[in-house]
Amino acid sequence: MSLNTTFTKEDGTEVVIPFNGSQNGHPENEEPEVEEAAEPSSSVETLCGATRGDIIVMKHTTKALTELIERLLHSDEFEVRRCSNGQIISQGRCNGTTPGNGIGGGGASSEELEKALKDRDAARAEADKLHANYATLFASFNTVREAANDIRGEYEDARDKLKLAAAEVDEWQAKFLAVKDNANSELERASVEYDDLLRSHDENTKGLRLRVKRQEIELSSKNDEIKVLTNRVSELSQICDQLLNDVDVSDGMSVISTDA
């Protein structure tokens, strides 16, 4: 879209005034405010239905219309073009107003001047509307940018907390692994001790069983000896009784023989 302004002189020649972004105190190398403000929150693609490109175009369009209105106010020559397609709406030349004479002749007619003034007022109203829309969009953009900064701060806090939680989890995991290794070593040691005790118990049990068996055998042999000795005592007792009876009989016979 061309924003250059063309004026027609009295001799019929056309003078084209190129659009310069450094007019009205704006340096050429100055970047649009919207672009600078959009850098902290590049993730916001649309704002109130308008993209960043729409906002930038609206800003430059507003600036161009403002400059055009200023040139119309301070120039006798005028030309009104549409910003959308560059179509010439009206052009001509008007005389300056001096005290006492009003609008002089020679140049554009009153109808053309009135039409140009109406077009100027319409362009000014459109520029004011665009400027108001731009201000509203810029305020909304600042609100969104502040919200994005708040979200970014919350994200940073959450990330720091997540790092602390991850470090704490790693610490607890290291402690758990240490306790697990200690428990495994203690379990292995207890298992070895249990196996040793079980083997010792089996050996002791076998030894005790052998001793019991040997004692049982010895007891059985002792019982057999006791039985044999008991039988011998019984036999000796019978023999003693028989001998005593025989002694008594022989004593009785001796007494009888003596009496005779």
Swiss-Prot record:
InterPro entries: TACC_C. GO terms for molecular function: protein domain specific binding. The keyword Flavoprotein does not apply. Disruption phenotype: Maternal-effect embryonic lethal. RNAi-mediated knockdown results in a meiotic defect in 30% of early embryos and defective microtubule related processes during the first cell cycle in early embryogenesis. In one-cell embryos, the maternal pronuclei fail to migrate and the breakdown of the pronuclear envelope is delayed. It holds the Pfam family TACC_C. It is found in: Cytoplasm, Cytoskeleton, Spindle pole; Cytoplasm, Cytoskeleton, Microtubule organizing center, Centrosome; Cytoplasm; Chromosome, Centromere, Kinetochore. It comes from the Eukaryota. Expressed in touch neurons. Involved in microtubule formation, polymerization and assembly, regulating microtubule nucleation and length. Plays a role in pronuclear migration and mitotic and meiotic spindle elongation during early embryogenesis. In complex with zyg-9, functions during the early stages of embryonic development to regulate microtubule assembly throughout the cell cycle. Specifically, the complex is required for the formation and growth of astral microtubules and spindle microtubules during mitotic spindle assembly. This is Transforming acid coiled-coil-containing protein 1. The lineage of its organism: Eukaryota, Metazoa, Ecdysozoa, Nematoda, Chromadorea. The gene is tac-1.
